[in-house]
Amino acid sequence: IRDDPKSCGMRSDGIDLKSEEKAPLETKSQTLYEVKRNPVFWIYSLSLSMHALFGTAIVFHIISIFEEVGKGKTEAFSYFIPAAIFSTTSNLLASWAADKIHLKPILSIMLVSFCLGSLGFINLQNNWGFWMLAFGFGVGGGLWGVLSNLSYIRFFGPNHLGEISGFSASLTVFASAIGPAAFSLGFDY
């Protein structure tokens, strides 16, 4: 049993054999202690966490959100189909592009799409608001999956990946846990 392709003398996926001489060197592995002092870690982790906070709040309260603007349960649940299509499409495209580009543009697009989804959320009474909500949170969710899987290995190396991604995941889980409660409090007051 081997831990990784490198230990068997094999190349990792995504390396073009024709451009082997141009292949980037493997990122130096950093410990969680070092990573916690790196602003790049916090930018990516907090961006992923913020998306989880809002996304979970919307999903948990989808019916009451739509009822607040005079729309019914059927319209509320119909949000999920276009959002899933946008999410799957953006995930496939970003997964393909991630081997060719830096992650910063993907993060930027995720944050812009999140803002568009938020704009759709506050204008949900309009038809365009519905589509902007589905597009924004759908695309953002698809890009969220790419970033949560690639950013830490790419920036901080493989040796402490479990520790680093686990800490980031705990921030995301915490954010997604408080999102629905915070939304309820905001709705009540």
Predicted segments with their positions:
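A late C-terminal transmembrane helix in Major Facilitator Superfamily
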Residues: F156-Y189
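Intracellular juxtamembrane helix-capping segments at the cytosolic ends
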Residues: L143-F156
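Helix-to-loop junctions at the C-terminal end of transmembrane segments
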Residues: S90-H102, F187-D188
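Transmembrane alpha-helical cores of Major Facilitator Superfamily
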Residues: S49, I81-I85, V112, F135, ...
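Hydrophobic core of transmembrane alpha-helices in multi-pass small-molecule transporters
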Residues: S49, G129-L143
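Flexible cytoplasmic inter-helical loops of multi-pass small-molecule transporters
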Residues: R2-S29
